[in-house]
UniProtKB/Swiss-Prot annotation:
Keywords: Ribonucleoprotein, Ribosomal protein, RNA-binding, rRNA-binding
Source species of the chain: Synechococcus sp. (strain CC9902)
One GO term (biological process): translation
Listed GO MF terms: rRNA binding; structural constituent of ribosome
Assigned protein family: Belongs to the bacterial ribosomal protein bL21 family.
Signal is among the record's keywords: no
Family annotation (SUPFAM superfamilies): L21p-like
Organism lineage string: Bacteria, Bacillati, Cyanobacteriota, Cyanophyceae, Synechococcales
Subunit text: Part of the 50S ribosomal subunit. Contacts protein L20.
A single cellular component GO annotation: cytoplasm
UniProt function note: This protein binds to 23S rRNA in the presence of protein L20.
Name assigned to this protein: Large ribosomal subunit protein bL21
Encoding gene, per UniProt annotation: rplU
Length: 125
C-alpha cells in the first residue's frame, strides 16, 4: 500500500539575511518583505525612503560590521501608513492631599515595509 500523506505546503520565501540600521534615534533589526513601526518619519504614504545608517549586514556569505557604518550599504523602505500607538495612561496621586493627575499619551508611528537591503549596489536576501 502506498503512503497517502498530503504533500507539504511550501513555506513563504523568507531569508536569513538582515540588517541593523539607525532610524528615529534607535537601532532596528530589519529583514526584507516585513513591515515595522518606527517613530514618526517625515515622509508621505507610498513614498520610498533610503536609509544609509546601516550598522551591520548579515547574509549567506557572512556578517559585515560597520565602524560605525557599513560602507556602500543601504536599506530601501516604503511608507505604508502613519499610525498612532496604543494609549499609555500616566496617573499620579498624592495620598491624603486630594491631588490627582491623569495623562494619556499615544506615540506617533510610521509603518514601513522593507523592500531591499543592498551592499555595494547589490541586493541581498
Amino acid at each position: 500500500m502506498a503512503d497517502t500523506k498530503p504533500a507539504a505546503k511550501a513555506a513563504p520565501e523568507t531569508s536569513d539575511a538582515y540588517a541593523i540600521v539607525e532610524a528615529s534615534g534607535t537601532q532596528i533589526w530589519l529583514q526584507t518583505n516585513r513591515y515595522y513601526d518606527l517613530d514618526r518619519l517625515q515622509a508621505d504614504v507610498d513614498e520610498t525612503l533610503k536609509l544609509d545608517n546601516v550598522l551591520l549586514v548579515k547574509d549567506s556569505k557572512g556578517t559585515t560590521l560597520g565602524q560605525p557604518y557599513v560602507k556602500d550599504a543601504s536599506v530601501e523602505l516604503k511608507v505604508m501608513a502613519h499610525r498612532r500607538g496604543p494609549k499609555v495612561i500616566v496617573y499620579k496621586m498624592r495620598p491624603k492631599k486630594k491631588t490627582r493627575r491623569k495623562n494619556g499619551h499615544r506615540q506617533e508611528l510610521t509603518r514601513v515595509m522593507v523592500q531591499s537591503i543592498s551592499v555595494g549596489g547589490k541586493a541581498i536576501g
